[in-house]
Swiss-Prot record:
InterPro entries on file: UPF0178
Source organism superkingdom: Bacteria
NCBIfam families per UniProt: PRK00124.1
Protein name, per record: UPF0178 protein Oant_1002
Top-level taxonomy: Bacteria, Pseudomonadati, Pseudomonadota, Alphaproteobacteria, Hyphomicrobiales
Membership in a protein family: Belongs to the UPF0178 family.
A Pfam family it matches: DUF188
């Protein structure tokens, strides 16, 4: 029986993703398909041949649900959403935040607990503000993490499209 290797693909939680241009460049270099998932229209550069737009309903978490349902080993999920990161990891996907943080099965529990605690503290008025502004250092860390994830998947037998 000849089993074809799985193709690496990138699934992007695209509504507020600050690194879409970087994803397009890396995907082009590695010949990888990209799926931008959003609940509204997202412009795609004309030369981004491997990028597909997936528009879901405007129902709460519809984009997250689509990404989680389509996550699998060989997929790289780009999201800042911690619950979505957890769901994608459960399906075997690699998960990277736009700031370059790599989520793993061994770290996601603490990350999810911290997120829930901070949400509770914000709701109670104990903590104000949000995350630090996105920086060039974050962009660089993201590019490094994405390249490393692709290399690891290729070494594990996944292929470029």
């Amino acid at each position: 029986m000849n089993i074809e290797p799985e193709t690496i693909r990138i699934l992007v939680d695209a509504d507020a993703c600050p690194v879409k241009a970087e994803i397009y460049r890396v995907a082009e270099r590695h010949n990888l398909p990209v799926m931008l998932v959003a609940n509204s229209f997202i412009a795609i550069p004309r030369d981004a041949e491997r990028v597909e737009r997936v528009i879901v309903s405007d129902k709460l978490d519809a984009a997250d649900d689509w990404i989680a349902e389509n996550s699998r080993p060989g997929a790289i999920v780009i999201t800042a959403d911690i619950p979505l990161a957890s769901r994608s990891l459960e399906k075997g996907a690699s998960v990277i935040a736009p700031n370059g943080r790599v989520h793993t099965q061994s770290t996601i529990g603490n990350t999810l607990a911290t997120r829930n605690l901070m949400d509770s503290l914000r709701s109670a008025g104990e903590v104000t503000g949000g995350p630090a502004p996105f920086s060039p250092k974050d962009r660089s860390a993201f590019l490094s993490a994405l390249d490393l994830a692709i290399v690891r998947l290729k070494r594990a037998g996944f292929v470029s499209g």
